[in-house]
Regions:
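An anion-engaging/catalytic patch
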Residues: 1-115
Length: 115
């Protein structure tokens, strides 16, 4: 199964990388989500808040090398959002659910007016 990596950027939240499978299922790089939601220890907090069936490990190229990282599905993303203590988590959820995911479902990619 081939996955396409997409990077989307938000002025407030920064970068979040996702992999979209051939059948259109998005998997979010857990560290990106955890960092944007204010978690202090990404791997530990992902394992604590995301059910095993909602996370997997995958290889991600970080610019220098390929590294194994935790990926979370949409359900895992919501678990991290709902467990975050940051006020901005609600805005992050609205951005992802109102803009990013609908765009992926419509176009197979995250599209903005700038693209």
């Amino acid at each position: 199964m081939e996955n396409r990596m997409q990077i989307f950027q938000n002025e407030e939240f920064g970068r979040v990388r996702i992999f979209v499978t051939e059948d259109g299922v998005p998997w979010f790089v857990g560290k990106d989500v955890a960092d944007n939601l204010g978690y202090q220890n990404g791997s530990r907090d992902i394992n604590r808040h995301v059910a095993p069936e909602d996370r997997t490990k995958g290889m991600v190229f970080d610019g220098n090398q390929r590294k194994e990282t935790i990926l979370v599905n949409e359900s895992g993303l919501y678990s991290l959002i709902l467990s975050s203590k940051l006020e901005s988590a609600k805005r992050f959820k609205h951005w992802v659910t109102g803009e990013v995911l609908p765009s992926i479902r419509r176009h197979g990619a995250y599209m903005t007016d700038a693209l």
